[in-house]
């Protein structure tokens, strides 16, 4: 089926095709273009709308400017029995982190657990996509990254010195959806702010503040110079700091004042850092028993007493529901984003979404 502008729905295959075609046009090899398209589409399918095709114009701009390498030589170095460091050669973060996940799974098969860092990587999109990669090997996955720009202050601070450095963990289940927690360390992700700006939706009054006055900012068009607040106050700021040190500093990637703003400085190399952890649950008990226990707890918790008019949700429930719906029905893309993607398709000489 083709995109239906009346319904506002775009088939997943059309989105994937647009991403892949644009990557090919800027010199990305076919196999890499397919991998990038797969991972970007997965972000859209699971509901991480600010990390899928929404990012395509930015990625294309960086590839054109040369601040992202379209043909990186990604290498794995400093490998030990349970650790490794992936050097991304300034390639697309999707390629670098997926290589890190593959390496972590391979090492964890031998050692039971592996931690793999990334340096000279780039923006990779939704954290939950990468934490979930070890699920395919029946392993627990964890992921964190240094965010693509600093928008958040330390506790009591008035300077944006921290990114929204995300963390995700994915735990395999049997018949139930896997448990997947994917969180920014800010009260909301900055991608959410950008989505609100794109759709002209007011911000919640506890999301951003004016750095001069401390007053709430609710106009999404005034967000560029506002401070994004950490989740749970100093706790969220502390998590952002520690994840930044582990994903950035530990790997020789950038963190803190050194970070390059992915959005405002498109011509500069970001040297983004990430890490992936893979853990084999069969080293602790029989795999099927563990997955059955995850199922049992999931059902018990999901069926617990809910507040009036609400239902109990577990991390990963909405993700699984959205994914099934969007595969079946297509993706709902904002009108402004459709305009941007149509303009990009025209510039790149590829089919627009509605033509696919």
Summary of predicted features, one role per range:
Residues 83-174:
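A generic, well-ordered mixed alpha/beta core segment in the N-terminal half of proteins
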Residues 190-255, 269:
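Small-residue-enriched flexible segments
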Residues 151-221:
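Phosphate/diphosphate-binding glycine-rich loops and adjacent basic-rich segments that engage nucleotide
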Residues 8-14, 28-54, 68-79, 268-271, ...:
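N-terminal glycine-rich anion-binding loops that anchor highly charged ligand groups
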Residues 51-105:
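Active-site cofactor/substrate anionic-group-binding motifs, chiefly glycine-
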Residues 138-150, 248-262:
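Glycine-rich phosphate/pyrophosphate-binding loops
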Residues 2, 6-18, 254-356:
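Catalytic-core signal marking the mid-to-C-terminal active-site face
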């Amino acid at each position: 089926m083709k995109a239906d502008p009346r319904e506002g729905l775009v088939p997943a295959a059309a989105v994937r095709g647009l991403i892949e075609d644009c990557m090919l046009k800027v010199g990305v090899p076919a196999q890499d273009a397919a991998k990038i398209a797969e991972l970007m589409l997965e972000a859209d399918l699971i509901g991480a709308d600010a990390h899928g095709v929404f990012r395509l114009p930015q990625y294309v701009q960086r590839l054109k400017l040369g601040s992202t390498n379209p043909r990186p030589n990604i290498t794995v170095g400093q490998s030990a029995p349970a650790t490794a460091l992936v050097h991304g050669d300034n390639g697309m973060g999707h390629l670098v982190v997926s290589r890190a996940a593959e390496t972590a799974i391979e090492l964890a098969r031998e050692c039971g657990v592996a931690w793999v860092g990334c340096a000279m990587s780039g923006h990779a999109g939704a954290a939950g996509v990468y934490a979930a990669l070890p699920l395919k090997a029946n392993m627990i996955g964890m992921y964190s990254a240094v965010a693509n720009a600093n928008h958040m202050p330390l506790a009591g601070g008035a300077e944006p010195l921290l990114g929204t450095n995300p963390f995700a963990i994915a735990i395999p289940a049997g018949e139930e959806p896997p448990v997947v927690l994917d969180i920014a360390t800010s009260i909301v992700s900055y991608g959410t702010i950008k989505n609100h700006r794109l759709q002209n939706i007011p911000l919640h009054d506890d999301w951003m503040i004016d750095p001069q006055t401390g007053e709430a900012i609710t106009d999404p068009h005034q967000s560029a110079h506002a401070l994004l607040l950490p989740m749970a106050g100093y706790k969220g700021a502390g998590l952002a700091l520690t994840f930044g040190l582990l994903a950035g500093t530990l790997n020789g990637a950038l963190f803190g004042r050194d970070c390059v703003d992915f959005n405002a400085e498109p011509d500069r190399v970001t040297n983004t850092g990430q890490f992936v952890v893979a853990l084999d649950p069969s080293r602790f008990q029989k795999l099927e028993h563990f997955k059955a226990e995850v199922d049992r707890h999931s059902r018990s918790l999901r069926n617990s007493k809910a507040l009036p008019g609400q239902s109990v949700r577990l991390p990963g429930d909405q993700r699984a529901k959205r994914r099934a719906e969007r595969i079946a029905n297509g993706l709902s893309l904002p009108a402004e984003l459709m305009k941007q993607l149509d303009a990009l398709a025209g510039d790149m000489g590829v089919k627009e979404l509605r033509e696919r």
